[in-house]
């Protein structure tokens, strides 16, 4: 009896144990279904060779960009210079056309005089051929009128020639031969530029080419801004070098500090805002 009761108890205990299994034990989860979403640090770690090549590429791109910007600014200045030269040439062409028209009009005005004189002489000779005395008087009157018209025509020619060739000597183009001449011409053009507020009109007023002034500008700027550097460059000797070579040496003598002063004076219109024709 005791054995049967113990078996029944164990069976009951077993049954209760089997029923309580799903509630007491934790569910078994497969660890393979969980994946890490955070990236590994090893994936972002690049080799040192790749990093150095990328840095070199960025430096080269920056250098090319800087060179492109400098070239763009130089081209912009060149365009402005060419536009001013174009305006100057247009003014010269307009002046030439207007002077040619005036000469043609003067020529046309002076031409009909002899024709009228010939017509008057022919009419007087043909209309009164029957009367010798009247014919002679008409011929003498025609000759007097012809001589008077001839004198007027000569006076007109003389006045036109004086107007054509009587240009003031101050407006004639002069060739500078030394540094003092370059400085004197530069100051004259600068004064005209400050009055007229136009580079092309200032060059036209003094009958000087823009490129000629630009090639000798470093000499004048060195004498105005930094005359103490003239000892480094030396005096100009026409027997040893040309004026263009001396101007290039003056350009190379302009250091960064002097160039900053020059640019500041150009912005304030105290120097001619003209670009250099030399390169370092």
UniProtKB/Swiss-Prot annotation:
Keywords: Coiled coil, Nucleus, Phosphoprotein. It comes from the Eukaryota. InterPro entries: CCDC106 (IPR031591). Interacts with p53/TP53. Residues 103-176 are annotated as: Disordered. Pfam families: CCDC106. Residues 103-121 have a biased composition (Basic and acidic residues). GO terms for cellular component: cytosol; nucleoplasm. The modification Phosphoserine is found at residue 130. This is Coiled-coil domain-containing protein 106. Residues 152-168 have a biased composition (Basic residues). Promotes the degradation of p53/TP53 protein and inhibits its transactivity. Residues 133-146 have a biased composition (Low complexity). It is found in: Nucleus. Residues 63-101 form a coiled coil. Its main location: nucleus. A motif (Bipartite nuclear localization signal) lies at residues 151-164.
